């Protein structure tokens, strides 16, 4: 049996993007549990609400690839008139902007929180490294001082004239 290819690429995805997809998935799943299409206020001035139904494969491809406008009309749109495809693209852009606005208004910005946590962890790790290096530096200074004292103690003995026993 041949393996099917994945509908998306396995590239690195930023944490904020994953969080956004996760939130969208939670919204869709909660609408399925409630027995119908999901209706949500997107936070725009008119209080307009959009109805979301299940995602089709073209929408998933659009979410994962984020293609330019030409690719959207060629890959995910059925043959329509130019006006209808432009209005559909505008609607998708409005939905995307609405989701972004909703996340910003709700105060959920996971990338910043995660980023701050990572920065804090890295800062703590760097502080530990600095402390270890300072201890090592102090130990090496003490070793240098000890060796310097040892050299100074042996130097007077080495200044005596050497006697060549073969000449006698």
Curated annotation (Swiss-Prot):
Region of interest: Interaction with TRIB3: 10-18
Compositional bias (Low complexity): 74-87
InterPro entries: bZIP (IPR004827), DNA_damage_induc_transcript_3 (IPR016670)
Feature: compositional bias, Polar residues: 30-43
Positions of the UniProt region annotated as Disordered: 30-168
Region described as Leucine-zipper: spans on this chain: 133-147
Chief location of this protein within or outside the cell: cytoplasm
A GO term from the CC aspect: nucleus
Location relative to the cell: Cytoplasm; Nucleus
PTM field: Ubiquitinated, leading to its degradation by the proteasome. Phosphorylation at serine residues by MAPK14 enhances its transcriptional activation activity while phosphorylation at serine residues by CK2 inhibits its transcriptional activation activity.
Keywords for this protein: Activator, Apoptosis, Cell cycle, Cytoplasm, DNA-binding, Growth arrest, Nucleus, Phosphoprotein, Repressor, Stress response, Transcription, Transcription regulation, Ubl conjugation, Unfolded protein response, Wnt signaling pathway
Ranges of residues in domain bZIP: 98-161
Example of a GO MF term: DNA-binding transcription factor activity
Keyword Translocase attached: no
Protein's GO biological process: apoptotic process; blood vessel maturation; endoplasmic reticulum unfolded protein response; ER overload response; intrinsic apoptotic signaling pathway in response to endoplasmic reticulum stress; negative regulation of DNA-templated transcription; negative regulation of myoblast differentiation; negative regulation of transcription by RNA polymerase II
Entry keyword annotation includes Cell cycle: yes
Family of the protein in this entry: Belongs to the bZIP family.
Function summary: Multifunctional transcription factor in ER stress response. Plays an essential role in the response to a wide variety of cell stresses and induces cell cycle arrest and apoptosis in response to ER stress. Plays a dual role both as an inhibitor of CCAAT/enhancer-binding protein (C/EBP) function and as an activator of other genes. Acts as a dominant-negative regulator of C/EBP-induced transcription: dimerizes with members of the C/EBP family, impairs their association with C/EBP binding sites in the promoter regions, and inhibits the expression of C/EBP regulated genes.
Name this polypeptide is given: DNA damage-inducible transcript 3 protein
Organism: Cricetulus griseus (Chinese hamster)
Taxonomic placement: Eukaryota, Metazoa, Chordata, Craniata, Vertebrata
């Amino acid at each position: 049996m041949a393996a099917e290819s994945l509908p998306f690429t396995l590239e690195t995805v930023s944490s904020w993007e994953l969080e956004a997809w996760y939130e969208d998935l939670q919204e869709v799943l909660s609408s399925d549990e409630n027995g119908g299409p999901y209706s949500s206020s997107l936070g725009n001035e008119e209080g307009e609400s959009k109805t979301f139904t299940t995602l089709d494969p073209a929408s998933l491809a659009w979410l994962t690839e984020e293609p330019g406008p030409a690719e959207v009309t060629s890959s995910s749109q059925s043959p329509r008139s130019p006006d209808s495809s432009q209005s559909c693209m505008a609607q998708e852009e409005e939905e995307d902007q609405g989701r972004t606005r909703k996340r910003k208004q709700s105060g959920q910005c996971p990338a910043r929180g995660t980023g701050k946590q990572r920065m804090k962890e890295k800062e703590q790790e760097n502080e530990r490294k600095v402390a270890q290096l300072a201890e090592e530096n102090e130990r090496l200074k003490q070793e240098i001082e000890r060796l310097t004292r040892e050299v100074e103690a042996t130097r007077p003995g080495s200044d005596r004239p050497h006697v060549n026993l073969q000449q006698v």
